[in-house]
Amino acid sequence: MAHRFKRWSLIALAFSGVGATAIITACSTINTANLFPTLNRSQKLIGFSDQNIINPDVVLKSALNDGSGVDSILRVSFGSALQKWYQANADRNISNRLKIFEENVEDEHDNLIDEKKRADRVKWPIEVQKEYDQFGGNQESWKKLKLYDRLITDFQSLIFNNISANVSLVNSSDTSVATTKENIEKTENKLKFINSNLNDVNGDFFTNLQAYLFSQWLIEENPFLLNQASFNYQSPIAGLGSIYDENAIGASNLNLSYNFPAFQDPSESGGQTNSAKLFEEFDKQLQTANSSGSSQSSAATNTRNDLLDFENKYSASKVLISKNNILSVLKTVNLSAAVIDQYHYLLNNKTELTTTTTTTTTTGGTSSNLNPLDKFIKSSSATTVMMKSAMTKSQEVTSDNNGFNVKSEFLKINPSLSSSGSDNSSNTQSFWKQVQALNNSSQTATIFDAVRMESNSSQAQVVTSNLLVSLSSKTTQKQQQKPVYVRGDDAIYAFHIDGGNYFLENSSPNKRNFEKQAEVLLMRFLQGQTNNFSKDNVSFSVDLFGSNSEFRSWANRNTTLKLYTALTTMLENGTSNNNGQKDVCDLAKKLLKNNTNLSETIKKQQDFNNSLSQIKSSYESYIKAANKLNNFRTDLANIEKLEQAIVDRANNYIKLQKEAKESSIGWGQPLPYKRANDGSYPSLAKFFNNNSDQSSAQTLTLKTTAAAITSDNEPTREKNNQTLKTLTTEVENKAKELVEKWKATTYSSSQYSEIITLKSSQLNDLDLDLILSLLTDSGIRTGTVANIFKNWYFKNTNSFTNNFDTSNKELKGEFSDFNDLVKQALYIRSWQNLTSKERFGYYKDLGSVNSTSTMLQMQNKAAQSHTSSSVNQTLLDLAKKAFEKELEDPNQDAEYKYMRFLQALMWLVKNGAQNYKNLLQQAIPIGTRAFVSWTVGYDKNPSATVSQKTKSSTSSANENPFNRFLQNPNYTQGSEINWFNDKQTPIQPDSLLESENTYRFTDEPFNNSVALSNKSQGSSDKKYFYGFNGLTINSNQSISTASAGLTQQLFNNYGQLITATDKAGALSQYKDKFTLWSLINKTSSDAELNAFGELLHRSVNVDTNNLSRFNSRGEPLISFDNKKKFLLNVVDRLDDLYFHKFEGYVGLSKAANTDGSNTEGYKTVQTVPLTNDSSIQTLSYVIQITNDDVNKISSNWKNNKANSLGLKKEIFMSLLIEQALDEGTQELAFLDLIRENQKQHQREHQQILVGDKRLYDILGQTLAINAKNF
């Protein structure tokens, strides 16, 4: 990175005022108008900002586009509607509640006034106004909002007050129907929301709302119950070291976990609960239940509803899963992914259920107590699971299977275990012996993260009738749902989606039958309440409607919007689908006892009805668009969370590889879900996004046919981004329509107010004015308004606009030569700033900024990439996407930062780079070392091991390492293990490189004779120099990315680099011998002479140790005059070569390179560690920079190296770009722009006058001045 200077301190603007003292007599009164003048004087500014930079339309659109507009609109309009519902309610208790709330608000207001008066008897009106400003700006709006907030909260509590009691059977006297598993078929169409309080005149109204909200939750959140059983890992009595190789793994790393699972042999349990024994019992019961298709006493199942109950002894539970909680409820991402896979597996494979009975045959004679881990490991050389279970040829492990081939360097088994000879050992030891035997043989052991049990009723020729196969295997026969087994961090888990085969219907338009899904949830809810399953050792409860339930948590998010949507849809009785709620309304009616007309209970109150209709008429199109956008953003957030969790999991294993701790990986493996070329996981993402084409994949983790692979791995990121843009545009268009209709104007609500409020100039509506006030508050606080203000300076200053191409967002005129280099630098910088680079996909080549794809081209490329044999994206393609993603977010200040950077670059370059020259003259005075450098990882004699790991370059061994583009430096793209499970396995990483500047590159710093020859012959291949560090200065103000090893060599130990034939660079910072001689001769300080002595010692190996020594009396051994004389004599005898600049390769030694004459000098240079404690070897290319170079900078720098620090033009331009990225430099340049803007617009002050304190607080005094001061 280029030299950067510490942030220049700015002189804060100071304002002072003269206080006035008022002497008040006992009989006088206070003239508050004089004591507290209007804070924003009308004659100066009643508006957000001077020059109309921020106007009402900007503020309102910012609030509406941000999505917060829905809450502001409904907080007022729906609160007002509810006030009418309370007022005219037939239930006197309801109308009385309104009166109580109104009295409470009055009391709260009185208390507020009293409190502020007690705190300050003089300034209390100002403090009260601050409270008003948070609620619309005046007393009336404050009271209204306080009342509306109370009504909305109370209304919600009334709705959910008795929801549990309202869920029952149509015939409530037959309580056994819903609580006995043998009778669950009798609940069909009989589980309803029924008004349980017939004396409540609002009972039917609330019951309808309950059914509607429950239906909306079910359709939006897709909740279902997950039957879960777990079998904890147990260490053998002899410890984990008896089965794993503790010496190879390390005792501290060997713990029961996903990587090192174990089960205790039943013979070792000593009466304690044994997980292996329980698992065997569970598995047999489950297989029996699935093969018979009948209801079993110990694994209660039913053929119609696909319901299953696990016994308590299996640590069983029913977990309510929804798309918003699946990642938090389940402990690890592989568990969540397995459940998602099971969901889609059922959705896409089931045709109809079967009750065909199959015969279960136990294999292996009378042997039992098999190790549960046997289910997760297979041999590729036979049709057998690791122990006894048979597999058919069609199900055997192939390269298409999503298992993971065990590597002996990962899974280290105790070497003392052997499968030779007779085996009288326990079953647990037998299992591990066979695992060890596989490790020692040519066979490949394949392990699985999760497996699914399948019934082979159609395959009579197979010995066993029940198998466990990987999640990637497809089943075509008709069958009952088969649970999935998953390896967790602490146990093996069994998962079964309760009723999954019953309510998931691939043939239906919605992929699931909402009515059946509701039936399963409600039936289980009633069962859990009565819990008559104790005789079967089964018990559970389902918290469906409690205050902490998922349903209530969902209802508490955006409550007002949900209530408004429910009521307005019910008002139409679902006759139209304008708000996308017809499915919800249809389900709600089915869940009500009489399929009632939902609108009847609302229309009984005409005023309430009219108010709802008015809201719908005024705001429906905007609310619908904003709600759709918000829901999609929530889906994307869930998808991002899932993908990040998978990436984090993979990176944990990559880290072990990087640290050469492969033995700690053990049973660790990639997850079996394929990642698309754009870094997304389409098969899992579809669970969260209702808009995805779920029918495009046959089975979402299947790898059996080309068609299935294609559809399953189709990239989704660009498609989602395009959808997000479309929805965002729709919201912006609807917001624009509202703002144009309102025609808002500014006013100051009080002489004590520090803020600006809005009102409609066209509509005389107090509630609308209150909405505008709320929108103003939220709009100002969005990043959009502040960014518009900041960007105004650039867009309204001639020196910037004259040199900025607004259509292409790049420089023009005399600065256009910088565009390619700017893109290069900013793209790579955005790429480096990514915390998860893997999520943007993969690349093979660097590419070029002149050939980077547009966003549309990238989208088309991603969509077609599944048909290509290779990934066509380049690094600069992906880096551009990262940069554009930053730039497009309106709430971020990326565009402001970008223009601020461009302004800084123009400021540095103008007038012959004079400002850059001024900065460098301060930073590199005579005697200060500085250099430009490049650093790469390098080992000229790599060991066999390192050479094996380093395969990222196919270049010739003689290629200069600085010219080499590395595809996978330091595991940037993962490892050859393919931990991310990409379509294309990443290339093996280059483990030598550990530099943040790996992909920062420039032109070659010298004129390479070979490259010039190729160019003359018509070759267009351009060689770059990678690992660019920029300018490094030996100064406390310097910020450099050069390695500590390199700076130590050049700043402190240069004497160790010089030889009898290569003395250049030792004292080049002094230009020549005379300059250094003169500085020493002028010195009048003993300490300075000692410093010169130390310099000569470190630079040219002169023995100067005696110069700073003292005698026993504390006196210098050598007098001041003799020191000076000695040092001057040393300088006189120095070879002039010491003062020549050095350019060339530097490590523990150095090799000069002048004008490309020694381009292979790197072969003779010994490398240096990256840092003092690093084993990574690095090599650097260095060009020294001196004060004399700085002084020669001039307007001719583009044509003469002597005027560009002795560097090629492109490298000098790269330094200017790096300096422009420095915040301190940007601040200086921006202040210069502000001064020019002031002069151009003939303002009294440099900053812009701002009339709203909220806006001023956000902008700060560099950009704005508070109008209250004038």
Swiss-Prot record:
Region (Disordered): 942-967
Chain coiled-coil ranges: 92-123, 175-204
Keywords: Cell membrane, Coiled coil, Lipoprotein, Membrane, Palmitate, Signal
InterPro entries, per the entry: DUF3713 (IPR022186)
Keyword Ribosomal protein (UniProt): no
Covalent lipid adducts (S-diacylglycerol cysteine), residues: C27
Compositionally biased spans, kind Low complexity: 943-957
Subcellular location: Cell membrane
Residue ranges of the TM segments: none
Polar residues composition-biased segments: 958-967
Major localisation: membrane
Record-level GO cellular component terms: plasma membrane
Signal peptide from the UniProt entry: 1-26
Summary of the knockout phenotype: Probably essential, it was not disrupted in a global transposon mutagenesis study.
Pfam families for the chain: DUF3713 (PF12506)
Similarity annotation: Belongs to the MG307/MG309/MG338 family.
Name of the protein this chain belongs to: Uncharacterized lipoprotein MG338
Protein's organism: Mycoplasma genitalium (strain ATCC 33530 / DSM 19775 / NCTC 10195 / G37) (Mycoplasmoides genitalium)
